[in-house]
A protein has these predicted regions:
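Catalytic core of nucleotide-sugar-dependent glycosyltransferases
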Residues: 206-214, 220-249, 265, 269-287
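Donor-binding/catalytic cores of nucleotide-activated saccharide
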Residues: 69, 90-201, 209-226
Length: 322
């Protein structure tokens, strides 16, 4: 069995896939398997995957119908044989000796965060090198995570899976998977679910991963109210596991924001009122008005909304709960 499994979802990435795979195959550490999940590519990507698999006996290809990156990653998780798991996007690449560095870390660590560099389409490179932190026990794990996301530069560091090392036994034992019909912040939800079972976390400043900010990545996808509602519910499921107040407040803010985003996109009055009721019950259950929560950011969110829409929400709450 290999020490490391590398899961790579592939979709129409023929332009960069070779660089991605070559950066892995050139590593000094070679006790790994590569799982290429071809997510219904319509270009040459699928054939390129097959070519590499025919040349290297540690590369496995799975051709799937197009179901999205989360489904592709889940397929990979089901097939992993390694003790550790990393995710790599098919248009990105690893630094030289990245795997040797990661696999040389302490063997009892459950989750590793590492540094990365962002490469923009105009050639600019931004380095993300978080402070070194070794956290023992779930309380310290929570502290390490909140220290990252309260840092303005690293607030979105939970929102990626390609900057982390996971243990396959935790993924399998607790059936941790990506939510397949969620295409917004699904990586963060996955990480929060996983981290609950971690007893040791390492945050490393070393640059290991190169992330390509593509043209398509710069285009904002329009999300439906169903997605925002699903995301709000997913955060609520994670919330029950965490005891750190700052981390709880962070998740509560995400829950409220996503409820508001869902409500804003619902045209059906009855359905909208149902969600407003759900949000109001959440407010009351969590005693949000009595918390030292950074609720001001939610108020700022509300104040940025069109005044007519804000008044509509306000009047709906008054009518529903009078």
């Amino acid at each position: 069995m290999p020490t490391l499994s590398i899961i790579i979802p592939v979709y129409n990435s023929e332009k960069y896939l070779k660089q991605c795979l070559d950066s892995i195959l050139a590593q000094a550490f070679d006790d790994f398997e590569i799982l290429l999940i071809d997510d219904g590519s319509t270009d040459f990507s699928g054939k390129l995957c097959d070519e590499y698999a025919s040349r290297y006996n540690n590369i496995y290809v799975f051709h799937e119908k197009n179901r999205g990156v989360s489904a592709a990653r889940n397929k990979g998780i089901e097939r992993v044989q390694g003790e550790y798991v990393i995710f790599v996007d098919s248009d990105d690449w690893l630094e030289k000796n990245a795997l040797s560095f990661l696999m040389a870390q302490e063997s009892d660590v459950d989750l590793i965060f590492y540094g990365s560099s962002f490469h923009s389409v105009n050639g600019n490179v931004t380095l993300y090198s978080p402070n070194l932190c070794i956290c023992h026990g779930f309380s310290e794990v929570q502290e390490g995570m909140i220290d990252l996301i309260t840092n303005p530069k690293y607030y979105d560091y939970l929102g990626f899976t390609w900057n982390k090392v996971f243990r396959s036994n935790i993924l399998k034992e607790y059936n941790i998977r990506f939510i397949e019909n969620l295409s917004y912040r699904e990586d963060e939800v996955f990480t929060l679910h996983y981290a609950h079972y971690c007893k040791k976390l390492m945050i490393l400043p070393n640059i290991v991963y190169n992330y390509r900010v593509s043209d398509t990545g710069l285009t904002k996808k329009k999300h439906t109210y169903d997605e925002f509602l699903l995301l709000s519910h997913a955060y609520q499921e994670s919330l029950i596991y965490y005891t750190d107040k700052r981390l709880q407040e962070y998740m509560i803010l995400q829950i409220i924001r996503n409820y508001l985003n869902a409500i804003k996109r619902i045209s059906n009055i009855r359905k909208r009122n149902t969600i407003i009721k759900e949000l109001w019950v959440f407010y009351q259950e969590k005693n949000i008005f009595d918390m030292s929560l950074k609720i001001k950011s939610v108020y700022r969110h509300l104040l940025c909304l069109p005044s007519a829409w804000f008044m509509n929400i306000y009047m709906s709450i008054k009518l529903l709960f009078k």
